[in-house]
Amino acid sequence: MKRAFIMVLDSFGIGATEDAERFGDVGADTLGHIAEACAKGEADHGRKGPLNLPNLTRLGLAKAHEGSTGFIPAGMDGNAEVIGAYAWAHEMSSGKDTPSGHWEIAGVPVLFEWGYFSDHENSFPQELLDKLVERANLPGYLGNCHSSGTVILDQLGEEHMKTGKPIFYTSADSVFQIACHEETFGLDKLYELCEIAREELTNGGYNIGRVIARPFIGDKAGNFQRTGNRHDLAVEPPAPTVLQKLVDEKHGQVVSVGKIADIYANCGITKKVKATGLDALFDATIKEMKEAGDNTIVFTNFVDFDSSWGHRRDVAGYAAGLELFDRRLPELMSLLRDDDILILTADHGCDPTWTGTDHTREHIPVLVYGPKVKPGSLGHRETFADIGQTLAKYFGTSDMEYGKAMF
């Protein structure tokens, strides 16, 4: 029986890549800088002391970081027994965004350039805005700028509630984000607006990767909170991913937990399970692992590392999240059967000590564990697509165009 379980710790980079200079990210190191802050006692909010990740360390995380950067992260045990196979992987794709990272993991790197809205003020073309106002019958719009999602709610949330004007904003990523109040504006109405925006961006040739619905609740600045009803409308991958091949060629099953289905525009996904927060995502993953049959992938994205702690530059929160993940990891490992493989990885970096609020161009960890997986180093991987090629070989699908099987 062939089953693979892929866990993406969204944004969990392990050191800047060779091309980081192109992105302004030389020296970025999500894991290394979190560990350093913990070791110095600078991340003692809601947790305390050196970064404590014994289970990830046993799977080779510290060694993978050493391969990427040349050193073991502060406070982590470089001499611990390693029971898994580990690697550090470079991104072939042109960007450092979520779709690029995930698609490349599934064997389809993004070799074209995404479109971006690079102006920090008046970010969107007037023609696009006019079409959205007309088609969605809007009273206007707010924002039209680059912003952090939580900051813009404090700035414009109250005005949005009074006027009914949606908040449009973007970032350094290829995204068009729309924030609206779940109750005063309405969740269905927000989703409909995002569908219209997706159509207009596609028809207009803007080449924007995602439209993201950002619903929130609350009644005044300071207590607005984004909810778990985020929805991403992505373009489809430019070629069949290993997920699609498993479904088409092997009549397999691919279970999305969290936002995976959105990232792949539902391509190659046979079941979607929604969950919000680390514990809920873990619980849903465990349930699906227990029910998984032959030729099945259970694919989970743990988004909180990125959205709650990476972008918000919350070192202590990120550290606490990693420690929670590590504590629960044995629950996943104990469910593995003889031929199963568990892959822990990431899609990009988002160093919470870095300037700004954007992603960072970093190597990702590739930690592979299973009863029949030989422990030890799998070395430096030139593309995340090595994961996809490894899965293609494992399940016996046709080869992916990119990547080399790791074993």
UniProtKB/Swiss-Prot annotation:
It is found in: Cytoplasm. Its EC number is 5.4.2.7. It catalyses: 2-deoxy-alpha-D-ribose 1-phosphate = 2-deoxy-D-ribose 5-phosphate; alpha-D-ribose 1-phosphate = D-ribose 5-phosphate. Mn(2+) 2 binds at D306, H311, H359. CDD domains: PPM. It comes from the Bacteria. PANTHER family: PHOSPHOPENTOMUTASE (PTHR21110:SF0). HAMAP family: Phosphopentomut (MF_00740). This is Phosphopentomutase. It comes from Escherichia coli O1:K1 / APEC.
